[in-house]
Amino acid sequence: MNDLRLTENQQALVDAEESMFAAACPGAGKTRAMVARFLKRTAEEERRGVALLSFTNAAVDEVRRRCGEHTRVLEVPHFVGTFDTFIHRFIVTPMYTTAYRKKPNYVQRWRDVPSANFRLSRMGQAKDLQLDWFDFAPDGRARLIESRIPRDFGNDAVRADLLERKRAAEEYASHIFGRLIDAGTISCVAARCLAEYWLQDAQGEQILAPLLRSRFAEVIVDEAQDCGREELRILQFLKQQGTRIIMVGDTDQSIYEFRSATPDRVRMFADNLPGRPIELKDNWRSTPAICAFNRSLRCGQLPETARGDNSLNLTPVHLIEYRSPDQIVPAALDIAEHNKLTADDLILLSHAEKHGMKAAGVHGVDSGKQNRIARIASAGHVLRSRTTDPRARRKAVDHVQHSVLAALTIDEKPGMEHLGFDALCERVGVDPRWLETFAVRMAISLDTHGKTRDVFAAEVRAFLRTAEWGNAKAPSSGSLGRLFRAPNESVWDGVVSTSTGPAIAFSTVHGVKGKEYPGVVLVLPERLRVDDVTTRTVVDDWEGGHHTEARRVLYVAASRAQQLLICAIHKKYISRIEAVLDNTGVPYTRV
């Protein structure tokens, strides 16, 4: 794509004078156009600010990078950050501080808080219930979402028992939710609930309206299709205060239904914006075959045309038929080599992490089952590997940090179960940033190569015992012995077998949203998820033209590819996928 000149429709987005929605296909240069608009609008506003919001830190970092030397646009009164950070800083913090006379402590997820898990009486061998399985109304009432209950929660009888006791579970979840709010521990979910509550409360509206009206002249929303009920309520409130709303997105890339993001709500909101809608329909990323594959998955009517250098690449989509997951990587590498790509150019994508890991030959470490020694060993492998993505590295560091923090808090007095990670660090006297550095250093320093599980466990305990803890109280040898025991042989064998790392990088589809790669290997596993309501799989949805999130996930995955798209399809589904591609005119070859 030309690095200097915007297309006509991109320029229209930059120059729009009313609140509006711009629909952008994959690779349409939306970030480039949004940053151009952001720079233009910040230069025009003398007193009020312009906010540019997205939904991931990676997307925000990319916006900041593209602002280049224009660093003043990243300073007050302007704002570039995630929508969650916007909610925290400009809505929840001022309101919570006023109501509770203390500052809130934000945590990313409920599972970062020990007391966010709970049990009902007579649950037997079932796992703990988690607040993440519930939706919360603005008044704090919980609603159990059956589809969020993991399959390994318990057998059919256990699941049936939970559903029979649904009201009791919801009441308990509401109680814990309220206790956490009172304690000042606010997850992203809780912050969105509180924001919605205060925006519909007369007193809250009276406080927030002048604050937001005087601060922001315009809010630009990237990946607008990911807006849920709460985000749309906030945008409506801002619009009512006279703030201009610019939304850019692709409703076919809406894959966050677990946080109440639904394309229909976004379309309805966008349809009521006064400005003329704009379509960015030129794909500057992918080949014609990949664009055709994308169109076969798209539910909306936005056209998509290959442009730029890759528009001249006539490589077809490649289908791999496999019976066993270990057949995928060798076949993909052969195809890549034939197309002048290397393993470093590829990424293996799957909807569920376990399917991608299995195809890549990686044994997962389940944070709910594995002991701390296994987590630390596995984290070291992840951090030393050249093929792990940032999300996997972040997850690995989190596992180690929480393991270390457990050692520092085990001897503390009761009453810490409602505290989040940062609050726990403050209680025991360690800086969270120091703890992160310590966790990385420990995981990388301790190598499993040639060591038994007992030897490695002893090295972990020694590392912690001899560490310099500064103002924090060092953990006792007894505590270290109880917390850091060697895993059993089968777990250790699984950890050690992954020490060399996978041949191809892998990730979930959600982990690469907004990114692009020369080659993508998309895995359709043998056991496809069956929707609890429709009883259909993603292949059923694709064949039948049903508009579902599972289908949109495949669309997001395929549209990351620039030059080569490989679909690894289990033998059970290969003929059905071929029929779909034939019917939709997708150029492909089967190997």
Where do the PLM segments sit?
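The feature marks helicase ATPase cores and/or their adjacent C-terminal helical subdomains
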Residues: 1-591
